[in-house]
UniProtKB/Swiss-Prot annotation:
Belongs to the IL-2 family. It comes from Equus caballus. GO terms for molecular function: cytokine activity; growth factor activity; interleukin-2 receptor binding. Disulfide bonds join C78-C121. GO terms for biological process: adaptive immune response; interleukin-2-mediated signaling pathway. Transmembrane segments: none annotated. Cytokine produced by activated CD4-positive helper T-cells and to a lesser extend activated CD8-positive T-cells and natural killer (NK) cells that plays pivotal roles in the immune response and tolerance. Binds to a receptor complex composed of either the high-affinity trimeric IL-2R (IL2RA/CD25, IL2RB/CD122 and IL2RG/CD132) or the low-affinity dimeric IL-2R (IL2RB and IL2RG). Interaction with the receptor leads to oligomerization and conformation changes in the IL-2R subunits resulting in downstream signaling starting with phosphorylation of JAK1 and JAK3. InterPro entries: 4_helix_cytokine-like_core (IPR009079), IL-2 (IPR000779), IL-2_CS (IPR030477). It comes from the Eukaryota. Its main location: secreted. Pfam families: IL2. Glycans are attached at T23, N106. This is Interleukin-2.
Length: 149
């Protein structure tokens, strides 16, 4: 009688361990998503830098919050929180392609960080310009990618 319960318990334990253990494919998938995010952020930065609208140059001086320390995937919560205000600032100045790019960035960030929202961002006292903000998140992606290789 107890033997069946013990076998069931062992089977359940093995199933839990197998499903929660990180696999190389999930690591590879995370790397690919980070590379995609990095590329999209670079394209957004390029779109911002190459825009000739004189009003946009004023908007580029607006400051955006950066987390005190962005070193883990959970810190993407901070990027997600700042993307909406960034999109609102840029929406009238950038092409439809850039707006789609912002949407892609949002989707990739959600995929990387998951639906977990319990993490609360601690923002630095100093804010960043839009260009600095994008550059720091591009660097963040590269840093995480390098730890996964």
């Amino acid at each position: 009688m107890y033997r069946m319960q013990l076998l069931s318990c062992i089977a359940l334990t093995l199933a839990v361990l197998a499903n929660s253990a990180p696999t190389s494919s999930s690591k590879r998938e995370t790397q690919q998503q980070l590379k995609q995010l990095q590329m999209d952020l670079k394209l957004l930065l390029e779109g911002v830098n190459n825009n000739k609208n004189p009003k946009l140059s004023k908007i580029l001086t607006f400051k955006i919050n950066m987390p005190k320390k962005a070193t883990e995937l959970k810190h993407l919560q901070c990027l997600e929180e700042e993307l909406k205000p960034l999109e609102e600032m840029l929406k009238n100045f950038l092409s439809k392609d850039i707006k789609e790019l912002m949407s892609n960035i949002n989707v990739t960030v959600l995929g990387l960080k998951g639906s977990e929202t319990r993490f609360t961002c601690e923002y630095d006292n100093e804010t960043e310009t839009i260009v600095e903000f994008l550059n720091k998140w591009i660097t963040f992606c590269q840093s995480i990618i390098s730890t996964l290789t």
